[in-house]
Amino acid sequence: MIRDRLAEAIQLRETGRAKQDQAVLEEARTLLLELAAAYPDDAEITFQTAVAHDNLGLSREAVPFYLRALTQGLAGPDLERALMGLGSTYRGLGEYRQAEETLRRGVREFPHNRAIQVFLAMTLYNLQDYEEAMELVLTNLMETTSDEKLQYFKRGISYYALHLDETWG
């Protein structure tokens, strides 16, 4: 029963997100809030409630749900998505140090998640750590691009991603 209602709420939220339908997103959020009240110790419900708030642009309201889900033992893909969501939310709220801490944890625990790395790069930019921000962006670009012109210069770009301030004299 509980998992069926949770699946229904997630499906509603995903439909609302895909269609950018605020009414459907609000319906999903309402259902998730009911589930969160009935099952306050369920990490997955708590996490999905955070996402529903984020999808509606209710970022400040999403943060406590993300934090609670993380302390409730969230794991696997949900943990990965929660770290990404919370880090991105903190960044959007201008809470750059919390964003950096959260996203660095995400990079440590999920090193192959390039989205987390790019959100970390944006956060580092906001913190005026331009060198590390550019290194992350350029490294991710060069490791994922199929653009033949970029591939032609891959060696040089990859080198300079780590040596941005170096000149030839």
Features from the language model and the residues they span:
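TPR repeat positional signature
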Residues: 5-8, 12, 46, 83, ...
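Short coil turns that delineate tetratricopeptide repeat
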Residues: 40, 74-77, 111, 145
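TPR/TPR-like (Sel1-like) alpha-helical repeat modules
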Residues: 71, 125-148, 158, 162
